């Protein structure tokens, strides 16, 4: 048996599985699951974690919270904290994640094997597929206003598009693809999803839900909302009496680049030397929250999950700058010419328009006349050198 297997390219990031898991053995975007390799049991010095007939058994009374299990976990899902039962992140084969998944893409190989969904990734610079439901979630997140909704479908103006992929990362129904690749989805959390007494039982929300996740009980005249869903807001938008309220909090968009400085998410462990080394500090061309919740390079404590943001030199700020203070320059590395952001403080009027459109939220006004703007990358590659010293090689030149 091989633990929990999620078909990542089909996942809607609804988090139903992670909410259902009693031992926190699933994380979504980025994906981490327990594979039942039993490395944690082998590392446990007290027998609190043991393998028994292909299952992991945990005895909290024997746990000394040493953290050996978390250190040994190859996927990084195992964790130890002060919340009972202390050691978390191991699959107990309860199958609750399988039952919770609304699109049946979770398997437990050797026990429950679900057929993979066919996912065809368009090999075009940017493409909106037939999966688009016209929910418009992509429209407000586009930093250059390149997306509109026409005839209930998202339409992208390729003359404006900077291919930052924020739309693809945000799309609730996996309908947008950039550069022929599977998008690295943003984290999201439904903060509240409610229906009030104003509901008139018209069932419009049931009809428009693309995933058939909303039900209506005609006997009790009650609309039942799902505990977790892709959060496209169509139900809320179409309710004729505004009885549905959906509040969603998105994580930061991930830096996706095809050329120049490239971040390899699967290699990053959010350690931070790259952010600290960036010579524009405190201009923060790289922002990170490490595994301990420490924001770098500012070194301020947060309660956020690990994240990585960097200037991707997309040019949104350059396009928006009304004074010419920001422009796209060139730099040569290893005989190849790359784009980089160049800034002239004397031309900056501190209007903040560049800050508003930055898809990575790295640009900030400082109030310093000599250096009024921070957060742009000059492609010096000092971050790559710092990362290489950690032997992670999560940053590279491409």
Curated annotation (Swiss-Prot):
Query: Which PROSITE patterns does this one have?
Result: 4FE4S_FER_1, 4FE4S_FER_2
- Which UniProt key words apply to this protein? 4Fe-4S, Electron transport, Iron, Iron-sulfur, Metal-binding, Repeat, Transport
Q: How is the cofactor bound?
A: Binds 12 [4Fe-4S] clusters.
Q: List the disulfide bonds.
A: none
Task: Identify which cofactors the protein needs according to its UniProt entry.
Answer: [4Fe-4S] cluster
> Which residues of this UniProt protein bind [4Fe-4S] cluster?
11, 14, 17, 21, 34, 37, 40, 44, 63, 66, 69, 73, 91, 94, 97, 101, 132, 135, 138, 142, 161, 164, 167, 171, 199, 202, 205, 209, 229, 232, 235, 239, 268, 271, 274, 278, 311, 314, 317, 321, 348, 351, 354, 358, 377, 380, 383, 387
Q: Which Pfam families match?
A: Fer4, Fer4_21, Fer4_7, Fer4_9
* A GO molecular function held by the record: 4 iron, 4 sulfur cluster binding
InterPro entries in alphabetical order: 4Fe4S_Fe-S-bd, 4Fe4S_Fe_S_CS, Fe-S_Ferredoxin
Q: What is the name listed in the Swiss-Prot or TrEMBL entry for this protein?
A: Polyferredoxin protein VhuB
